[in-house]
Amino acid sequence: MKKLKITLVKSPIGYKYDQKDTVKRLGLRKLNSTVIKDDVPQIRGMIRKVRHLVKVEEIEE
């Protein structure tokens, strides 16, 4: 199954609450923090919502 490496590259300060909440629910707390998540439609939707704040890489496992 594919995995996604998600890195927070821009601060969510100054953005709407729902975007801040999405970043938090992805597990990203501080700038340049990274999480690895399964490549599922729910996570893709969350990434799409905050695509201007994160960097995404696909990794094989």
Swiss-Prot record:
Entry's Gene Ontology molecular function annotations: structural constituent of ribosome
PANTHER family named among the record's database cross-references: LARGE RIBOSOMAL SUBUNIT PROTEIN UL30M (PTHR15892:SF2), MITOCHONDRIAL RIBOSOMAL PROTEIN L30 (PTHR15892)
Keywords: Ribonucleoprotein, Ribosomal protein
Translocase keyword on record: no
Superkingdom assignment: Bacteria
Organism of origin: Thermosipho africanus (strain TCF52B)
Name this polypeptide is given: Large ribosomal subunit protein uL30
UniProt keyword rRNA processing, yes or no: no
Pfam families listed in its UniProt record: Ribosomal_L30
InterPro entries: Ribo_uL30_ferredoxin-like_sf, Ribosomal_uL30_bac-type, Ribosomal_uL30_CS, Ribosomal_uL30_ferredoxin-like
Family of this protein: Belongs to the universal ribosomal protein uL30 family.
GO BP: translation
Subunit composition and interactions: Part of the 50S ribosomal subunit.
A single GO cellular-component term on record: cytosolic large ribosomal subunit
